[in-house]
Amino acid sequence: MPKNSKVVKRDLDDDVIESVKDLLSNEDSVEDVSKKSELIVDVQEEKDTDAEDGSEVDDERPAWNSKLQYILAQVGFSVGLGNVWRFPYLCQKNGGGAYLLPYLILLLVIGIPLFFLELSVGQRIRRGSIGVWNYISPKLGGIGFASCVVCYFVALYYNVIIGWTLFYFSQSFQQPLPWDQCPLVKNASHTYIEPECEKSSATTYYWYREALAISSSISESGGLNWKMTGCLLAAWVMVCLAMIKGIQSSGKIMYFSSLFPYVVLICFLIRSLLLNGSIDGIRHMFTPKLEMMLEPKVWREAATQVFFALGLGFGGVIAFSSYNKRDNNCHFDAVLVSFINFFTSVLATLVVFAVLGFKANIVNEKCISQNSEMILKLLKTGNVSWDVIPRHINLSAVTAEDYHVVYDIIQKVKEEEFAVLHLKACQIEDELNKAVQGTGLAFIAFTEAMTHFPASPFWSVMFFLMLINLGLGSMFGTIEGIITPVVDTFKVRKEILTVICCLLAFCIGLMFVQRSGNYFVTMFDDYSATLPLLIVVILENIAVSFVYGIDKFLEDLTDMLGFAPSKYYYYMWKYISPLMLVTLLIASIVNMGLSPPGYNAWIKEKASEEFLSYPMWGMVVCFSLMVLAILPVPVVFVIRRCNLIDDSSGNLASVTYKRGRVLKEPVNLDGDDASLIHGKIPSEMSSPNFGKNIYRKQSGSPTLDTAPNGRYGIGYLMADMPDMPESDL
């Protein structure tokens, strides 16, 4: 692509220093703050004259008040609940400390390059996901629509999880915590412990019976759970109020929602390190099992976690970056946010396993105490001789080391009869190996551990407030991935669209607050996003590298950043990343095919979970979720390819922003202009002369070079303009 002669070639190190200074610069003058608050998009202010009334309209796009606000928004979107309850589980399951190496490798090979790609296209084209991919190629415009559909599917159930967290948060202001003990059941004759709770645990019972009031299968609706319905309504009201003014409102909230979780995690880490057993948990967590690095499953799960941890394919990354200045160093942002995400995951893993180590130590002490009593009974009845017990061991107050010595002795002496003695080894590692993830970690394992904390209500309030903020940060990015592209494309008022979007989502979300709602959350989590997002990101990579052209894209980046990106990205975007994404897609499809579609149902009579297969209608819903999410891609391609919709009426609308209002202004196009905008290749154009009205008035007089090899003419030419026009494609 033709280079902008005004570009200043800067040294990469100097550019990074500038970015850091910009990020840490918060002491702006009153005039600077006023200028930033004006939400000006272009370097030069553009003013257009309305054809009907001759009034001037400031063509402005909302922008971030500061670089710090933008970084916090990206961090808030990428750092979510998965960092707390998914990454630690994967780390423990896949080799402990050894898992970090494949994760880091894949972060460098897949994560950072693709994250940088999404930031770049959003910042350069200054549109949401629909407008960006329409600009690259109208035939690939369905990629943006697919991203919006996936975002909406995810938002539907993700906010339900925030609703659950709100419920636990509201119940945490009690001493003792309501899930501390099993409830008692009274009848006319006597009082006894609730059988379902006695068979499981107090926290498990509270989660399934008190919070979810869960049914025994997905086919048993059981009606609405009114407590959770109210919490879901509160969650959607919070999201709606935060998003109703776009980044003007959500950006300010990000200062708290993005930073508060780090305060809580650090407090939890310091407190848990002072508890018995926490070091055992951390040691168990990070003890590397190097042999597991050779297993393909470990690499597949690491790649999947990298992919979803950064929010690739959702459109939120593109939407947030579209509000940046054009010369913002998005490469610095990509590296910074990616490593903040990684170190947050490691910090959360330290906290989780320090707390679980403390919990395992308590469980282990109970196990030793109970089994020591059993050994004393065996000694008193003569089943085991006192002579085999070392004299220095006191079974009334036995330590873990002494118990294991006695256990090993009895196992050798009573080798044939040992099984009938029902003694347990009571190893703390056995408890730590019972890895849990997701809601099981947050609402069962972690809540149980916190009941043993001094001042447990305080820590419970802090923990669930942290989860609420983590969830809301991700929700803001997800909703922005829906709102921004739709506003850019269909010219609707952002406030009205936000309210309608949230209201409709709440109504659909009522299916998740039935007594069987937890099973629908599992269904949507398993099938609505994984494969569709992989396909979306593969198509994004292909669109930039092969349709638009990797060389032209790198020239755009050089013009935009002021320095040439490393050749590393050329090879990643053109060869390595597409190959690895396709491999990951195939591996995910194979894994999905080998795993029977089903869910873990809570069986009241057994007080335990049991795997059940989905009924036939459930299978249809699972398949429909995947198809609906990716359907816009072929539909838009066929419509554009076959010209089923006439775009060349000569009256397109371009969106402008003024004082928070979205205005429509007609742009009359000559025939040649329309053919350019609608993506016709040069051979299909009726005239080589460009029309007069394609571009709005520019502040300079840039030189246009034609692209003899450009496939989509207008996409090539528009990117050369210092102040790129707002494309409606």
From Swiss-Prot:
Protein keywords: Amino-acid transport, Glycoprotein, Ion transport, Membrane, Neurotransmitter transport, Phosphoprotein, Sodium, Sodium transport, Symport, Transmembrane, Transmembrane helix, Transport
Catalytic reaction list: L-leucine(in) + Na(+)(in) = L-leucine(out) + Na(+)(out); L-isoleucine(in) + Na(+)(in) = L-isoleucine(out) + Na(+)(out); L-methionine(in) + Na(+)(in) = L-methionine(out) + Na(+)(out); L-proline(in) + Na(+)(in) = L-proline(out) + Na(+)(out)
Membrane topology: Multi-pass membrane protein
SUPFAM superfamilies noted in UniProt: SNF-like
NCBIfam families referenced in this protein's UniProt entry, alphabetically: Na_transp
Similarity field: Belongs to the sodium:neurotransmitter symporter (SNF) (TC 2.A.22) family. SLC6A15 subfamily.
Protein name from the UniProt record: Sodium-dependent neutral amino acid transporter B(0)AT2
Organism whose genome encodes this protein: Rattus norvegicus (Rat)
Phylogenetic placement of the source organism: Eukaryota, Metazoa, Chordata, Craniata, Vertebrata
